């Protein structure tokens, strides 16, 4: 029996987004560390807020970072 995801983002979409991040980065190691750090930060934020995360922090970090790459207007200017 196949396990269905609760999210509209499929594994192939996640892989495609991760590949986009890696190909856009000048350094594969650095982008990997950035994704890991964001996921770690999200995990601690979810833990501090007593939220039950519906999506794993690494997947959420990949989605957020790829969205920032493809849609720079969501970051906003400081």
Swiss-Prot record:
Superkingdom, taxonomy of origin: Bacteria
What are the record's GO terms for cellular component? DNA-directed RNA polymerase complex
> Cross-referenced Pfam families, in alphabetical order?
RNA_pol_Rpb6 (PF01192)
Annotated SUPFAM superfamilies: RPB6/omega subunit-like
Any idea which GO molecular function terms this record carries? DNA binding; DNA-directed RNA polymerase activity
Q: Which InterPro entries does this entry report, sorted A to Z?
A: DNA-dir_RNA_pol_omega, Pol_omega/Rpo6/RPB6, RPB6/omega-like_sf
Alphabetically ordered keywords of this record: DNA-directed RNA polymerase, Nucleotidyltransferase, Transcription, Transferase
Query: Which EC number(s) does UniProt give?
Result: 2.7.7.6
Record's catalysed reaction(s)? RNA(n) + a ribonucleoside 5'-triphosphate = RNA(n+1) + diphosphate
Specify whether Disulfide bond is a keyword of the entry. no
A Gene Ontology annotation in the biological process aspect, one of them, is: DNA-templated transcription
- Membership in a protein family: Belongs to the RNA polymerase subunit omega family.
Q: Subunit structure, briefly?
A: In cyanobacteria the RNAP catalytic core is composed of 2 alpha, 1 beta, 1 beta', 1 gamma and 1 omega subunit. When a sigma factor is associated with the core the holoenzyme is formed, which can initiate transcription.
Q: What does this protein do?
A: Promotes RNA polymerase assembly. Latches the N- and C-terminal regions of the beta' subunit thereby facilitating its interaction with the beta and alpha subunits.
Identification of the protein by name: DNA-directed RNA polymerase subunit omega
Organism encoding this protein: Nostoc punctiforme (strain ATCC 29133 / PCC 73102)
